[in-house]
């Protein structure tokens, strides 16, 4: 049960809750498209604390809360908040919790959301902590796979790009261990999946590593593409050595199954060519669209009756 619980890691969401969120997300999507809003949380307030830039995640959380009839108070620029004066994360969270019923936080330091949860009894939702995890994106990604392809089990998921710093990758590969899937990892050597993420998997048998996307593109059901995380590199020469390592274009997509999808947590830089956008496999804008109903479902599971 997620009632009044924090979601800091994808491990905080058990399978029963996950499938309930999927069903509720479908209902929320239908409500949005027919009525616009589902005023189920009219007396609730969400605080959003974003210490890192965000467009889709912040807007989708705020839209989700508004569509549920709730209110939002936000800090989207820490330069204009007391954090600029040296206020600790703990004190900011304590203050935000006194003004709200739930807190959504994004922070550049891995583990910040878990730390924040120690200083409040209010639910904390992790909207991304450095190169750690991004659990709500993972719920959205799993929902997208299920909605687009009918099921998650039996699929081949190929992840390509920045597997070292990409927190969406880390959360998703952990969650996929619950399903009957095969996962292909394609990246430059220096952007391989970190060993600590491997250590969180029950086994490695469903995961294989490759350097060449051509080896696995034909068997792929879900091509999950990520940008190279420039902001995570301490050595910009290292970044320059890997930028543009993989670029998905229409020729790449022609080698994929007809019934397959390309996903991306966005924003993209140059890893997916615009000539892919109108191809039937391109699901990344639909994926972003599903973000609001999925987050509505999660928020309601936490705060609803």
UniProtKB/Swiss-Prot annotation:
Listed InterPro entries: Asp/Orn_carbamoyltranf_P-bd (IPR006132), Asp/Orn_carbamoylTrfase (IPR006130), Asp/Orn_carbamoylTrfase_sf (IPR036901), Asp_carbamoyltransf (IPR002082), Asp_carbamoyltransf_Asp/Orn-bd (IPR006131)
Metabolic or biological pathway: Pyrimidine metabolism; UMP biosynthesis via de novo pathway; (S)-dihydroorotate from bicarbonate: step 2/3
Gene3D superfamilies: Aspartate/ornithine carbamoyltransferase
Primary enzyme class: transferase
Keyword Transferase attached: yes
GO biological process, one term: 'de novo' UMP biosynthetic process
Residues annotated to bind carbamoyl phosphate: 56-57, 106, 134, 137, 266-267
Record Pfam families: OTCace (PF00185), OTCace_N (PF02729)
Entry EC no(s): 2.1.3.2
UniProt KW keywords: Pyrimidine biosynthesis, Transferase
Protein residues bound to L-aspartate: 85, 167, 227
Residues annotated as signal peptide: none
MF (Gene Ontology): amino acid binding; aspartate carbamoyltransferase activity
Catalysed transformations (reactions): carbamoyl phosphate + L-aspartate = N-carbamoyl-L-aspartate + phosphate + H(+)
NCBIfam families assigned: asp_carb_tr, PRK00856.1
Function: Catalyzes the condensation of carbamoyl phosphate and aspartate to form carbamoyl aspartate and inorganic phosphate, the committed step in the de novo pyrimidine nucleotide biosynthesis pathway.
Subunit structure: Heterooligomer of catalytic and regulatory chains.
Family: Belongs to the aspartate/ornithine carbamoyltransferase superfamily. ATCase family.
Protein name: Aspartate carbamoyltransferase catalytic subunit
Organism this protein belongs to: Thermoplasma volcanium (strain ATCC 51530 / DSM 4299 / JCM 9571 / NBRC 15438 / GSS1)
